[in-house]
């Protein structure tokens, strides 16, 4: 009910933020798919979009698999898992805030490259830990290295990709959202 009231309220009270002069002359599915085609031919848009999509694969597979890994393989209770999950969730907030601070001093593409490399290190570490059944604390550190950069990569990927789209910004935003959740949604049941 609350969601329905919010939708109605936003339709009635929130004004359109895009000025009439900046709106596209034609809209609809045909225009959206035409814009998708143009965007998918732009490597400087596609690369951040794919990196962002893979980051959501990491996030969604972590969310799907970690309860089973921690509770079934490592024998922890649901409460212990909840504390670990919350702690790693806090690293997402820290990463988001840190990204907002660092973007003033470091080029966003370099920052995204660095955060992506951190995630790759996390993937390698978590894989090695799980294959060798190493200590839980090493796994937790691996999860932190793997998951903490998600908010930074997602934000930077979106910003970098949107900077490359000169027209059809709505289509750009839709495509970015589609890819990240499509990749994540497809990966979740596979783990």
Residue ranges of predicted features:
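Pair of pore-lining "gating" transmembrane helices in MFS-fold secondary transporters
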Residues: 41-61, 144-148
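Small-residue hotspots at the loop-to-helix junctions and early N-terminal turns
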Residues: 78-86, 173-174
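Juxtamembrane intracellular "pre-TM" segments in multi-pass secondary transporters
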Residues: 15-49
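C-terminal transmembrane helical hairpin of 12-TM major facilitator-type secondary transporters
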Residues: 109-157
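A late C-terminal transmembrane helix in Major Facilitator Superfamily
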Residues: 148, 158-191
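Helix-to-loop junctions at the C-terminal end of transmembrane segments
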Residues: 95-110
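Short amphipathic helix-loop junctions that connect adjacent transmembrane helices
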Residues: 64-80
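C-terminal membrane-cytosol helix-exit motif in multi-pass small-molecule transporters
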Residues: 2-22
């Amino acid at each position: 009910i609350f969601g329905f009231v919010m939708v109605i309220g936003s339709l009635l009270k929130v004004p359109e933020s895009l000025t009439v002069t900046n709106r596209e002359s034609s809209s609809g599915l045909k225009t959206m798919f035409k814009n998708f085609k143009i965007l998918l031919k732009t490597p400087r848009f596609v690369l951040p979009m794919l990196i962002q999509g893979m980051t959501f694969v990491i996030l969604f597979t972590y969310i799907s698999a970690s309860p089973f890994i921690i509770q079934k393989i490592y024998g922890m209770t649901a409460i212990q898992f909840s504390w670990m999950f919350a702690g790693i969730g806090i690293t997402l907030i820290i990463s988001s805030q840190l990204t907002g601070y660092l973007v003033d001093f470091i080029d966003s593409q370099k920052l995204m490259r660095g955060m992506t490399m951190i995630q790759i290190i996390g993937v390698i570490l978590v894989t090695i830990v799980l294959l060798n059944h190493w200590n839980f604390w090493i796994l937790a550190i691996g999860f932190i290295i793997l998951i903490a950069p998600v908010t930074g990569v997602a934000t930077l990927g979106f910003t970098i990709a949107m900077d490359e789209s000169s027209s059809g910004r709505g289509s750009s935003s839709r495509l970015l959202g589609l890819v990240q959740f499509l990749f994540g949604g497809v990966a979740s049941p596979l783990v």
